Amino acid sequence: MGQKIHPIGFRLGVQRIWTAKWYGSNRNFSDTLLEDIKVRDYLKKKLSHASVSKVLIERPAKNARITIFSGRPGVVIGKKGEDIEVLRGELARLMSVPVHVNIEEVRKPETDAQIVADGIAQQLEKRVMFRRAMKRAMQNAMRLGAQGIKIMSSGRLNGAEIARTEWYREGRVPLHTLRAEIDYGFAEAKTTYGIIGIKVWVYKGDALTRGEQPAAAEQEKRGKKSGVKHAAAS
């Protein structure tokens, strides 16, 4: 089950939060949801080179607050904040309410699944070999603290006549474990041969409950205890 289901949807309410926070009545729920989809599509096209990880949409009392998580916040803000003002105006027109835009920096974009997937897609569109792009992304993620990463590419890889799927994994990626912090990203590369889909899973460690110790510390503690017993016996 963990292999097939969407890793973020699987963990919603357990250790992940929703990326849309608002309440809609039965009468206007569908219109508000459609607005959200249009806003996300617009931001995806507009900020395609700004390494956007996710977009959080909140709707407090007749206005909207949009938080953009980006690996390159300077690209979003623009020179002297000009670009963000234009962006705010466009979003206000789309949503028909006053919009406040916040920019949050992603500290380690190399370990963010969505940014990694977008980066690989951009490389494939520039005719970089898919294996090289995947392996380079995996090395960067592991070097910067990811405990495991899995990347899957599907489509006419290297222009092959028959579409196929190839994937690589480094480290652990426990998709069944609910407490495991799994980040997931998906992107499409529009190549001359057709569309290639890229999926990325990044394992960042376990979400610990209060008073619980990480697995490594627990093993070390057990080792010390067994060492004391051994010394006492000798």
Curated annotation (Swiss-Prot):
This is Small ribosomal subunit protein uS3. Residues 212-234 are annotated as: Disordered. Pfam families: KH_2 (PF07650), Ribosomal_S3_C (PF00189). It comes from the Bacteria. The lineage of its organism: Bacteria, Pseudomonadati, Pseudomonadota, Betaproteobacteria, Nitrosomonadales. Residues 39-107 form the KH type-2 domain. GO terms for molecular function: mRNA binding; rRNA binding; structural constituent of ribosome. Keywords: Ribonucleoprotein, Ribosomal protein, RNA-binding, rRNA-binding.
